[in-house]
Each structure stands twice: as structure tokens, then as C-alpha cells.
Amino acid sequence: MEEVCSICLEVLVDKEAFTEPCLHYYHNECIKEWTKRANTCPKCRRDYSQIRIGEEVISVKNRSLELHLVDETLEETRERLISYTNLCALCEDPSTSLIYCESCGGSFHFNCIGIGDELDSEWCCPLCGMFQNHLGEASNRNLISATPVGEGRRRVTSIVNTRRTNSIYRSHSNRPAQRAHLMTDSDYTMIVDQHREKLLESQLQESNTQSSGEEESWKLLDEALKSGTQNSQSSEFSTENNVVPLKNTHELGRKLKKPRRASGIKKNVVERSSSHQSTQILKPSSSLISDLLLETRGNSRHPSFTNSTQKLTVEALQSHDPTLKLNIPKTETLSLDQKIVIQKLFIKPRLRNLYDSNTLSKDNYIEINKIICRRLYDKFLQDQLALAYLKQVLEVKERLHGHDLKQFLAQFTHWSELNDFTDDKWQKQETEGSCNHKQTQILSMFDSIIDTMLQNELHKLLT
């Protein structure tokens, strides 16, 4: 087996350089660089005094540091290794039958360190590596405290605890919040009086800020609430055939609102009544009045007396009564399949030709496609014959190719090719997709519209 250099882990070809006295071989450059930093052998960690490279002998300076340790420091380091609980340091199982180390104070089971029950056998501590004889068992912490290690532990522990207590006291006594126990009763009384004066001053300032105008506004609001409550109670006893005109409804809503100028109220009532009185007669409901009263009471603590108040209009009544909502027609939109037919048969062939001829870039292609598609969708929605044509194309697709619309449309490059379309499955001419004369005229007109749109967009790009 080839020997390798322990420094660079490469194969040793020429064994020329070695250390003395351990006689371990290395590369010349490797051992020289190693010697600049340490004089211990990389393999066995023994100190060497010189190295031999062939016939050359190089002396090595001792680079080990001399350590001057204090006994108290050693005892404190030793203290950290002492087991403070009756636990085995290897299996961490509590037991009263333990053996302890004289050097580090670690506790172990007899079976864990492999000495059995022989009292005169030697054993090695797994923690500190100290060889020692079996001296006895450590059943509790009192046995450890009887040794020199226990005495040193007590001395170091007392010093550390004293220093820790003093530092904690100093850190807490320097904080203002921790000096509260040093204050007298007179100090507490002075602090309470200062806070009471500040609270009284703030309350006086808030009470002075309330003006006389606000007091009058509050009074008017209370009167409006009282009148609204009376009207709501009287409406509960009214019959179902009682019909209230729109003008009276506005007057009832005006009583529930905040005070405003009379001129603005009259003008608003005339405009609202003239626009809606001739069209419909509204019937007030008790739920509407109760909702408005609850809404007014909820905002009564912080009212804002402005002219932009919510009025009792037809729209407000419709939001409470679903039977009064107007039937607003929904705007018709194209389906996804119809949009695909328009793109594949009308727009894509033209844009594809421009893109293949390098007239349009990729970004321009996408942008123009969006613009033309949106405009053409609106054109198709406005013409019923064009919509009928789209439905006919989708019916042919469903009969012949099921749900694969793109595969069906990939066979054509223009909408006119559907007129001559034949299928082997049907073995006959399909007339559902063919256009009549009016549809052909409309779709041809769409072709001219698309060409005009393309010319305009290309002109914008060039300019």
C-alpha cells in the first residue's frame, strides 16, 4: 500500500524528508511550511526537534506555549465538570450505585465503564481521560463534597454567587423603575397629586371647546329623533292599503335628517318629485323607517352638520325593498369559443403574414392583436347575422370534431373556406357552416374593416 503525506494527502514518491525522533515521512515543501507554524508531528502530535531532508538536517524551534495557570482557575474549570445530580454521565440514568472520578467529579455506573464489581481494578474516566483505581461508590452528593474536589467546588461556587448577586443588585438599582421601593409615602402622594392636576386641566379644556352652536345642534337632533319615533309608531297601526305619494315620502325623510337651510330643502324636493312622481307611487315600510332611525342613532354621538347629507330618494328605497329594483338589462358578451373563431378565421391569418414577413415584431404583434380583437368583438355583438354565423361554425365543430375547436379551425386560413368544407365522416356537403348572401356581405365588410384597422395601426408604428 502506498504511503501518503499526512499534510497534503498525496502519495509519497521519494521518502526523503522525515521528522525526528518519530521518523514520519512527508513531502519536503509540506513539512517546511508546517514547521513555520508548529513543531508537533501531524501524525502522532509529538514534538520534534529537527527534520532531515536527505543528508541535510534542519533544527526546529520549540513553538509550544508555556501556560501559567492559577490554582483557583483550575478549580473553577474542574468545577464545571462536576456532576451536580446523581446521574450517570454516559447513560444519564439516575441511580444510587455510582462511581466518581477524582479528577473531574463525573459519576458513572460500573457496567457503563466496564469494570464490573471488582474494587481493585483500574479504570479510565471517559470525560477527562485520567487513569485511577476504584475507590468507592458515590451514593449521593455528600460523598463528592467530602473530597478535595468538593471543597474547591464550594469555594468557587461561593465566589461566583457573591459576584453574581452584587452585579444583579447594581444593574437593578440603577434603573428608575427598580428604585420604587426606596421611595417614601410623601413621594407617592406628590406623584398622585401631579397626575390629578393634569387630568383636571385636560377635562376643563375639553369642556371649554364645546361651543354654543354645537349645543343647539344637539337639541335639534334630539327633536328630530323624537318626531321620527312618533312617525314610526303611527305607521305600524296604519292599514296595508295606505299609499303615500313620493312628495310625502321626501318630507318624512327630511324630518329624520340633520338641520339644513329651508331654501335648499324646497329646491331638492321639487326636483325629486317632478322627476319621479309621474312614474311610480311608493309605499313606505316600517322596516325602512326603523333602519333609518337605527342609522341616525348610531351616528348621533359624532354628527357632522354639512349640506352633503344623504336624502330619502328612490334609490335609497330600492336598496331596502327588493321589489322596487329596476330591471337593468345585462350587456351581452361573446363566449370564449366565439372569440377563438374570430381570432383564428379573421385576425390571425393577416397578422401571421405580417409577422412572417418581418413587418411586425413580437411585441407589436401582441399589441395590435389586442386592439383589433376588442374592436371586432363589439362589431360582432352589434350584428345578429354575424353572431348567427359564429353559432353555425360552433355547431359544425360539435358534430364533426367534438370539443377540439382549435384542431378544427387549424384546417382553414379564412372564413370563406367553410363554404366548400367536406368531411369524410359525413360523406356529404355540410351546409350548416356555409354563409347565405347577407352573411357573406357582412363578413366581407368585416374583412375590409380589419384591413383598415391594420393599416391604421401600422401607420402609427411607422410614425
UniProtKB/Swiss-Prot annotation:
<keyword id="KW-0863">Zinc-finger</keyword>
<protein>
    <recommendedName>
        <fullName>Autophagy-related protein 36</fullName>
    </recommendedName>
</protein>
<dbReference type="InterPro" id="IPR001841">
    <property type="entry name" value="Znf_RING"/>
</dbReference>
<comment type="function">
    <text>Micropexophagy-specific protein required for efficient micropexophagic apparatus (MIPA) formation but not for general autophagy.</text>
</comment>
<dbReference type="InterPro" id="IPR019786">
    <property type="entry name" value="Zinc_finger_PHD-type_CS"/>
</dbReference>
<feature type="zinc finger region" description="RING-type; atypical">
    <location>
        <begin position="5"/>
        <end position="45"/>
    </location>
</feature>
<dbReference type="InterPro" id="IPR013083">
    <property type="entry name" value="Znf_RING/FYVE/PHD"/>
</dbReference>
<feature type="region of interest" description="Disordered">
    <location>
        <begin position="229"/>
        <end position="281"/>
    </location>
</feature>
<dbReference type="InterPro" id="IPR019787">
    <property type="entry name" value="Znf_PHD-finger"/>
</dbReference>
<dbReference type="Pfam" id="PF13639">
    <property type="entry name" value="zf-RING_2"/>
</dbReference>
<dbReference type="GO" id="GO:0008270">
    <property type="term" value="F:zinc ion binding"/>
</dbReference>
<dbReference type="InterPro" id="IPR018527">
    <property type="entry name" value="Rubredoxin_Fe_BS"/>
</dbReference>
<comment type="subunit">
    <text>Interacts with ATG28.</text>
</comment>
<dbReference type="GO" id="GO:0006914">
    <property type="term" value="P:autophagy"/>
</dbReference>
<keyword id="KW-0862">Zinc</keyword>
<dbReference type="InterPro" id="IPR011011">
    <property type="entry name" value="Znf_FYVE_PHD"/>
</dbReference>
<feature type="zinc finger region" description="PHD-type">
    <location>
        <begin position="85"/>
        <end position="131"/>
    </location>
</feature>
<keyword id="KW-0479">Metal-binding</keyword>
<dbReference type="InterPro" id="IPR047157">
    <property type="entry name" value="PHRF1/Atg35"/>
</dbReference>
<feature type="compositionally biased region" description="Basic residues">
    <location>
        <begin position="255"/>
        <end position="264"/>
    </location>
</feature>
<feature type="compositionally biased region" description="Polar residues">
    <location>
        <begin position="229"/>
        <end position="242"/>
    </location>
</feature>
<dbReference type="InterPro" id="IPR001965">
    <property type="entry name" value="Znf_PHD"/>
</dbReference>
<dbReference type="Pfam" id="PF00628">
    <property type="entry name" value="PHD"/>
</dbReference>
<keyword id="KW-0072">Autophagy</keyword>
